[in-house]
Amino acid sequence: MTDSDVQPPKIEFPCERYPIKVIGTAGEGFSDLVIEVIQRHAPDLDASTLVMRDSRNGNFLSVQVLITATSVEQLQAIHVDLRATGRVHMVL
C-alpha cells in the first residue's frame, strides 16, 4: 500500500463529541469569540467542555470544545468563520 492509497477516516454524521481545537493570539475575549463563532453553527455547544491552554510564553492560547458535528459543510463553515476573525491561526 502506498501513501496515495491511504484514505483519511470517514466521519459518520451526526458525530457526537467531535473535538474542535482553535489556536490563536492570546488576549482578552479570545475564548468568548471562539465560543460565539462555533455556537452560530453548533447551537448545542456545551461550554462546560471547553479546555484552554496557554502557550509556554503566553503569546498563544488554544481553546478546545466538543460539538455534535452534523455535516462536512458545518465543519467547513466553522473553520471559515473562525479564520475570518483575524485572531485565529489554526483550527484542528
Swiss-Prot record:
It comes from Ectopseudomonas mendocina (strain ymp). Belongs to the UPF0250 family. The lineage of its organism: Bacteria, Pseudomonadati, Pseudomonadota, Gammaproteobacteria, Pseudomonadales. SUPFAM superfamilies: YbeD/HP0495-like. This is UPF0250 protein Pmen_3793. Gene3D superfamilies: 3.30.70.260. GO terms for cellular component: cytosol. It holds the Pfam family DUF493.
